[in-house]
């Protein structure tokens, strides 16, 4: 069995849970990051400010590294790679405008679906960042 995990912006809250599930099931964890071709792709974790993103990644790596087996190496590799990749703030000259537009689109989709991303963002740091966009 293999687990396929795509890390999204809200999904950074589930990294540890996916790691634990992989270990419980003794399943290989295939990991990737949500693709983004512009700064409006608010579901990409690369929309987060670098300091916040690195803080979350470092917390997860501190938990994962001592416990990992080769089945979870993909997760470690992707997390380490995310720390070296440019965030939207570094890559796009008008990142703030794109991120605001992405937030507006996400909220419109929430209204259609009857969902609320603010209820999904249980990490207080992510919720605070979201509210301040």
Language model segments and positions:
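Radical SAM enzyme [4Fe-4S]-AdoMet core and its adjacent flexible, acidic
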Residues: 1-133
């Amino acid at each position: 069995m293999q687990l396929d995990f795509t890390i999204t912006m809200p999904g950074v809250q589930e990294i540890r849970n996916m790691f634990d599930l992989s270990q419980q099931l003794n399943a290989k964890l295939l990991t990737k990051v949500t693709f983004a071709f512009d700064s409006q792709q608010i579901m990409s974790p690369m929309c987060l400010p670098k300091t916040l993103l690195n803080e979350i990644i470092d917390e997860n790596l501190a938990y994962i590294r001592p416990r990992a087996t080769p089945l979870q190496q993909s997760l470690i590799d992707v997390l380490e790679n995310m720390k070296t990749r440019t965030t939207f703030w570094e890559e796009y000259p008008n990142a703030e405008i794109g991120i605001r537009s992405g937030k507006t689109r996400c909220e419109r989709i929430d209204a259609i679906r009857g969902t609320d991303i603010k209820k999904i963002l249980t990490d207080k740091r992510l919720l605070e960042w979201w509210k301040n966009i």
